[in-house]
C-alpha cells in the first residue's frame, strides 16, 4: 500500500520532526494525530509541506488526546486501546458500533482473569477513543503555507556533519529516496563516522524525568541504569557553575570531599521516556512530566556535555557513583525504551571505551549499535572511541578472535620496534625513558595509554630514517593496549554460533 485511506500518527514527535506521514494518505483520506495540542497549537507544530498536502488533497484531519485519556483511566502510557477505537470510528472498515462491541468482547475475554477493574478500564478506553476525536477545520491558507524558520546548521567535525546532513537527516525524515548515490561515496568501504546519534534529537518521549536537586542523594543510580545516556551527573567548578545556563539546577551541597557543584543534566530530546530512572531513585527525586515543559533543560544538558570537563578525582572506575561521571561512549541509541542491553554496553564504554574493539553478532545489539549514518557509539574529546564491526550471525566468535589476534600481531611487531629503539645508542635519554615506561606498562590499559602518548610525542620530536620509528608512527593507533569485546545475544551464543561452524 503506497497510498492509504487512513493514516494515524500515534507519536506527536513525528509531527514535530516533519516526518512525511501525511503524504501516504490518498486525496480525500483521513489523517489522525495523537497529541495533547489544541487546534491552535497543532497549527504551530505542522510544517508547511504537511499543511500544503492536507489542504491541496482535501485530507480530513483529526486529533485525539490518547495520552491524557490513557493516563486518566489508569492505563499509564498504554494508548493503543484508545487509538484502536479511534481507528474503527474513522476508518469505516467495519460499522463502528460493531467494531466497538467486538473490541469490548475481546477485552473481556483477555482481561477477565485479571479482575473486573481491568476489564472496566479497557472498556472505558474503548469508549473514550471513539468519543474523543476532534475534527480540525483546515484553513484555505494552508495550501500556500511557508515555513518561516530556517533549519539550524549542524556543527562538528566536517566528515561527520557531511554524513549527518546528506544521509542521516533526509533518512530520519522518511525522505530516504531523495538521497543520491553520491552521498555514500565516502562510505563505500562500509565505514561510517561515529557520534551521529547526538544529532537526531528525536523527542519521541511524551513524558520525561525532571530532577529535584533538593532531595537528591547523588547516588547516580539513575545514570547507571539509563539505557540511552540521557541522564548524566556532572561535577562543576565554580567557573563552570557560574557560566551554566540560568535554569541549571544545582544540588545545595558540593560533591563529597570536593568543592565541585553537583548537577544532574537530562536531555529531554534524547530521552525515550522508559521511567527506569524513576524506579531506581532511592529518594524519589525524579518524577515524570510532559516533555514539552522540560525542553528548556536541553540547553543545560548540551552545556554540560560541551563545556564541563571530566574531573579525574571523581570520575573513576571504582564504584557505581564514580563511574557515572565518566563520559559514556554509547549514547542516544535506537534501542527500545528501557532496554537493558544498552545499559550494560554503555557502562562498558565508560570503563574501556577509548581503547575498545567490539565484534558484534547480528541481532538487537547490531541494529541499535550499527545503524548506517546514525551510529550511537561516539568518541571522546581526543577523538578516541569504540571501533565497532558486525560480520555475520554465525561467526561472531571467530570474527572477534580475529580482531584480537590481528591487533595483537601488529602490536607485538611495534613492541619489538620499541625495544629496538630503546637499545639503540643513537636514542636520546628522553626517548629511551619513554620506551622503558611504555614497555613497563604493556598490560595496564590506563598506564599504557599515557605511556603510549608520551612515547609518540618523543618520537615525533626527532627526525631520523629509523625504520622502527617510521613503523611505530605509521601504526601508532595499534601501539597501546586494547580491550576487545564480543557482543551477541542468546541466539548466537547458544544456537547458531555455538559450534563455531560457518
For each predicted feature, which ranges?
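Structural motif
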Residues: 5-7, 29-32, 59-62, 80, ...
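Active-site-flanking alpha-helical
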Residues: 87, 228, 497
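Ferredoxin-type iron-sulfur electron-transfer modules and their immediate structural context
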Residues: 99, 112-271, 278-485, 491-492
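Glycine-rich, charged/polar anion/phosphate-binding loops
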Residues: 15-18, 46-48, 68-69, 195-196, ...
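A short alpha/beta connector and helix-capping loop motif
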Residues: 496-502
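Acidic, glycine-rich active-site loops and adjacent beta-strand->loop/helix elements
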Residues: 12-14, 37-39, 67-69, 107, ...
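Active-site cofactor/cluster-binding pocket
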Residues: 1-171, 241-246
Amino acid at each position: 500500500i503506497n497510498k492509504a485511506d487512513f493514516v494515524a500518527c500515534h507519536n506527536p514527535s513525528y509531527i514535530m520532526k516533519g516526518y512525511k506521514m501525511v503524504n501516504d494518505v490518498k486525496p480525500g483520506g483521513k489523517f489522525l494525530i495523537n497529541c495533547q495540542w489544541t487546534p491552535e497549537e497543532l497549527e504551530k507544530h505542522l510544517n508547511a509541506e504537511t499543511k500544503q498536502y492536507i489542504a491541496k488533497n482535501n485530507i480530513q484531519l483529526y486529533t485525539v488526546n490518547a495520552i491524557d485519556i490513557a493516563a486518566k483511566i489508569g492505563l499509564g502510557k498504554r494508548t493503543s486501546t484508545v487509538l484502536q477505537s479511534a481507528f474503527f470510528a474513522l476508518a469505516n472498515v467495519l460499522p463502528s458500533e460493531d467494531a466497538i462491541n467486538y473490541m469490548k468482547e475481546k477485552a473481556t475475554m483477555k482481561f477477565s482473569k485479571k479482575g473486573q477493574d481491568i476489564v472496566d478500564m479497557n472498556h472505558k478506553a474503548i469508549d473514550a477513543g471513539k468519543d474523543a476525536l476532534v475534527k480540525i477545520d483546515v484553513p484555505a491558507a494552508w495550501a500556500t503555507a511557508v515555513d518561516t524558520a530556517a533549519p539550524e546548521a549542524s556543527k562538528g567535525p566536517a566528515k561527520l556533519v557531511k554524513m549527518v546532513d546528506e544521509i542521516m537527516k533526509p533518512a530520519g525524515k522518511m525522505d530516504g529516496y531523495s538521497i543520491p548515490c553520491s552521498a555514500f561515496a565516502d562510505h563505500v568501504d562500509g565505514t561510517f563516522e561515529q557520534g551521529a546519534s547526538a544529532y537526531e534529537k528525536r523527542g519521541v518521549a511524551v513524558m520525561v524525568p525532571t530532577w529535584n536537586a533538593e532531595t537528591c542523594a547523588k547516588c547516580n543510580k539513575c545514570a547507571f541504569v539509563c539505557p540511552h545516556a540521557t541522564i548524566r551527573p556532572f561535577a562543576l567548578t565554580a567557573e563552570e557553575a557560574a557560566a551554566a545556563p540560568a535554569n541549571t539546577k544545582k544540588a545545595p551541597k558540593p560533591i563529597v570531599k570536593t568543592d565541585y557543584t553537583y548537577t544532574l543534566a537530562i536531555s529531554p530530546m534524547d530521552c525515550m521516556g522508559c521511567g527506569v530512572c524513576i524506579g531506581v531513585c532511592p529518594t524519589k527525586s525524579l518524577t515524570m512530566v510532559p516533555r514539552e515543559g522540560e525542553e528548556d533543560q536541553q540547553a543545560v544538558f548540551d552545556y554540560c556535555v560541551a563545556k564541563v570537563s571530566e574531573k579525574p578525582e571523581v570520575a573513576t572506575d571504582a564504584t557505581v557513583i564514580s563511574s557515572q561521571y565518566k563520559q559514556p561512549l554509547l549514547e542516544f541509541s535506537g534501542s527500545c525504551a528501557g532496554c537493558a542491553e544498552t545499559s550494560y554496553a554503555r557502562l562498558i564504554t565508560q570503563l574501556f571505551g577509548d581503547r575498545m574493539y567490539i565484534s558484534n553478532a547480528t541481532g538487537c545489539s547490531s541494529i541499535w549499535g550499527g545503524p548506517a549514518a546514525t551510529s550511537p557509539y561516539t568518541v571522546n574529546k581526543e577523538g578516541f572511541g569504540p571501533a565497532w564491526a558486525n560480520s555475520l550471525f554465525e561467526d561472531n566468535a571467530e570474527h572477534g578472535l580475529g580482531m584480537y589476534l590481528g591487533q595483537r600481531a601488529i602490536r607485538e611487531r611495534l613492541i619489538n620496534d620499541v625495544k629496538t629503539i630503546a637499545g639503540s645508542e643513537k636514542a636520546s635519554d628522553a626517548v629511551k625513558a619513554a620506551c622503558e615506561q611504555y614497555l613497563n606498562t604493556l598490560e595496564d590499559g590506563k598506564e599504557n595509554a599515557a605511556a603510549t602518548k608520551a612515547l609518540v610525542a618523543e618520537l615525533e620530536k626527532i627526525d631520523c630514517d629509523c625504520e622502527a620509528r617510521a613503523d611505530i608512527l605509521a601504526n601508532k593507533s595499534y601501539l597501546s593496549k586494547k580491550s576487545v569485546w564480543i557482543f551477541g545475544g542468546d541466539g548466537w551464543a547458544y544456537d547458531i554460533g555455538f559450534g563455531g561452524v560457518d
